[in-house]
Amino acid sequence: MTAKGSTKQEILDAALELLSVQGYEATSISQLAEAVGIRKASLYSHFENKQAILDALMQATLEQYEQHSIFAKADWDDPAFTKDKENMTPDMAVQLCLGQIRYILHDPQISRARKMLTIEQFRNRQMASMQTKRNYTDVMSYFTGLVRFLIRRGQLAEADPEIMAAQLCLPVSVWLNLCDREPEREAEVTRLIERHIRQFFDVYRAK
């Protein structure tokens, strides 16, 4: 990476850190330049304005999400995707969910991006759409697909797949948001999620 490219990335990293705490309106170009250790005028050689920095951050966040999220990659009509889920057990479901949750909570970029989206979703329509897609639409689509798949395989009882998926994943989303606000409660939340998933499989296990 060139020196200019390195500085540009440093600006984006500093911007993500500041925006995830202060939000867009409260973060100034002067603060960003100071965080990187460059003059304000120098920052403009990398980005035209603050909005350009935000746009670049949104693009980087979207690319990372598409690359790493299990929800973005789901294709329940693809045998290669479903192969390792054919004999899904409660233990497997627990590990699947907890693995994704740990990644979301502990990857610095993803964690900060989530907080930035939470702050900015009420000001920026594009961020609101991204927040809905990442935290609701894709999650519900993934778990609805999983439930339908397990019903077809005779592992779960016949019921409304979308409602079953909501019962499974939406409480987890609430607990995940709790961890964002109170990270010291992660161990408690992890135990709750495990109990929740196991009870779901007990309730809906095919007779």
Where are these regions (language model features)?
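Hydrophobic/aromatic-rich alpha-helical bundle segments in the mid-to-C-terminal region
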Residues: 129, 133, 137, 147-198
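Hydrophobic/aromatic residues within well-ordered alpha-helical segments
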Residues: 50, 57, 61, 65, ...
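Short amphipathic alpha-helical interface segments enriched in basic and hydrophobic/aromatic residues
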Residues: 16, 20, 24, 62, ...
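Helix-turn-helix
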Residues: 10, 18-60
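Hydrophobic alpha-helical connector segments
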Residues: 56, 69-108, 164-165
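Alpha-helix N-cap and coil->helix boundary residues
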Residues: 27-28, 109-113, 159-163, 188
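N-terminal intrinsically disordered/low-complexity leader segments
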Residues: 1-6, 76-77
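Amphipathic alpha-helical packing segments from all-alpha helical-bundle domains
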Residues: 105-118, 122-152
